[in-house]
Amino acid sequence: MSVALADYFADVHSSDVFDYGFGSISDFLKVKPVVPYDWVIANPPFRLAEDFIDRSLKIARHGVAMLVRTVFIESVGRYERLFKTRAPAIFAQFTERVPMVKGRIDRKASTATGYA
């Protein structure tokens, strides 16, 4: 995602808790930002997505965009904790299924999972 985002943003910072050979190695939920961020754009682990959104809303000056499974928005508990007071401004559902293949693009891959 970072390479594509660099086509549109002057400064892109990338990190992950694992070394994928790109960006820094750090835990987004624990590290203190060294600079203020205009946007936080992420594909968080599903089980941590709510925490990522909470943290992102605190440190982003302009906006937050998350790539999550569509079912993320379907939880009553998540609605009460997250969306009731901070509803998404835009919910952009992918019209086709987007297979997530670790570290590569596989045009023959398929999935039953929807993403937004």
Q: At which residue positions do the language-model features occur?
A:
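Class I S-adenosyl-L-methionine-dependent methyltransferase catalytic core
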Residues: 1-116
